[in-house]
């Protein structure tokens, strides 16, 4: 797909990296299994949900191919959610978790945030909400309109994982052209100039993430879409005790926005 987009030529040509990422997204969107994973977790407690109760929710494997069916994801009183999906003092057009506002928990219920708990350093350690039992996915009440949907995993029914967030190696679009300019400006050798262009965030390892148990059956190099995050594959370093995932590409072109 990438070759089809850029065309065929016998001449040296520079193509935007975003074109390659776009082709990869298009390919993986068609064949990657969807799962929920929480990379920067904070605990979400549904205070009016019965303690000890567990429900099985259905999640679609791949909306591009309904014939691939669904899988089960457990729902319980205590969940992990993304820390970035909560804001205590949110701006007007913030549609995720904030006190007094409703959001939909994907494949589950609509909940209303009631507050949070902080530690002595002022860091949020728990988020609290109440659920509406009539809004379970598939019930008539689920049709109630809310503007935000967030993903989650059950604290008692998930796997611990390490996630390796690979990104672009270079900070510049064309390292070859930038190399000479940096060497001249800083009066340095080629190796030093190359180091100037390396993206310090080209690899970010997150050791304490959580993913739904369904991913345990995936073989090394299997592709997954972490919903709302990006496309990942199972690393060969994975073990039954702790899985390891590598990011192939995000859902959106972040670099394109930065450059604008």
Name the predicted role of every residue range.
Residues 1-260:
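Polyanion-binding catalytic cores of nucleic-acid enzymes and NTP/SAM-utilizing transferases
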């Amino acid at each position: 797909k990438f070759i089809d987009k850029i065309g065929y030529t016998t001449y040296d040509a520079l193509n935007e990296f975003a074109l390659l990422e776009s082709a990869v997204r298009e390919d993986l969107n068609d064949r990657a299994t969807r799962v929920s994973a929480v990379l920067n977790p904070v605990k979400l407690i549904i205070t009016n949900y019965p303690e000890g109760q567990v429900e099985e929710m259905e999640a679609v494997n791949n909306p591009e191919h309904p014939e691939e069916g669904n899988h089960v994801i457990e729902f319980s009183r205590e969940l992990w959610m993304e820390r970035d999906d909560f804001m205590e003092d949110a701006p007007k057009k913030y549609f995720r978790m904030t006190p007094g506002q409703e959001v939909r928990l994907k494949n589950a219920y609509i909940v209303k945030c009631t507050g949070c708990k902080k530690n002595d350093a002022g860091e949020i350690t728990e988020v609290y909400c109440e659920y509406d039992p009539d809004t379970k996915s598939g019930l008539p009440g689920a049709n109630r309109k809310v503007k935000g949907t967030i993903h989650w995993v059950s604290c008692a029914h998930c796997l611990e994982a390490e996630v390796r967030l690979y990104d672009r190696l270079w900070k510049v679009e064309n390292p070859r052209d930038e190399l000479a300019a940096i060497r001249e400006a800083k009066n340095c050798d080629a190796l030093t100039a190359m180091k100037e262009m390396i993206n310090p965030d080209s690899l970010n390892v997150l050791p304490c993430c959580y993913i739904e148990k369904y991913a345990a059956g995936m073989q090394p190099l299997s592709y997954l879409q972490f919903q709302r995050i990006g496309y990942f594959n199972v690393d060969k370093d994975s073990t039954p005790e702790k899985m390891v995932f590598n990011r192939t590409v995000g859902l959106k072109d972040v670099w394109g926005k930065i450059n604008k």
